[in-house]
Amino acid sequence: VCGLGSCMKKAESTEKSWVEQAVENARCQIGLEIDTIEASGKVLNPVTLNENEQVYYCGFSDWRSGFFPGSVWYLYELTDDNTLLSVAQKYTEALDEAKKLTWHHDIGFIVNCSYGNGLRLSGKAEYKDVMIEAANSLCTRFREKPGTIQSWNVSGNSWQAQRGWECPVIIDNMMNLELLFEATKLSGDSTYYKIAVAHAD
């Protein structure tokens, strides 16, 4: 029994140091990116490296734009480093216009990662308003007849139209339902909840 107990303690110790190392690696990588962005004098959303190994940045309407502020929020949560709090708020609030996006379904990715984590970790009241407005924007994509949230618009000679699609719905859309459930909690309005459930059904 003694031997088994010490094995378990060693495993816990190894696992903890692995987690701590992962957090430290994340802190280093995100810190380097913050330094790079800050040196540019702009507020940018890094996505990946392009073919020239340069950082590719996206605008607020890109489906990936909330991931960087979300990562900073998670790092703040894991480290309690208050310098990250102001950075997370800055990069989150740079996405303010995303709350008005109605031409694609990805608003849940954008807003939940950034404002959702910001509300959860900072309690800033204005983040609640952004979440609810974003949920309203997402609800404009709900189509009564099929009971789903349409992923993309289909118009003219778009690639969606060329495929004969009328109301495309992709699995990613399920990740937007969290925004609707949260909007019901924040507002007390069950409309968001009902749309989320209809889509899931």
Each language-model region and where it sits:
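Bacterial N-terminal signal peptides
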Residues: V1-G3, T92
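A general, composition-driven signal for non-globular sequence regions
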Residues: G3-L4, V111
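Glycan-recognition and catalytic cores of secretory/periplasmic carbohydrate-active enzymes
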Residues: K10-D201
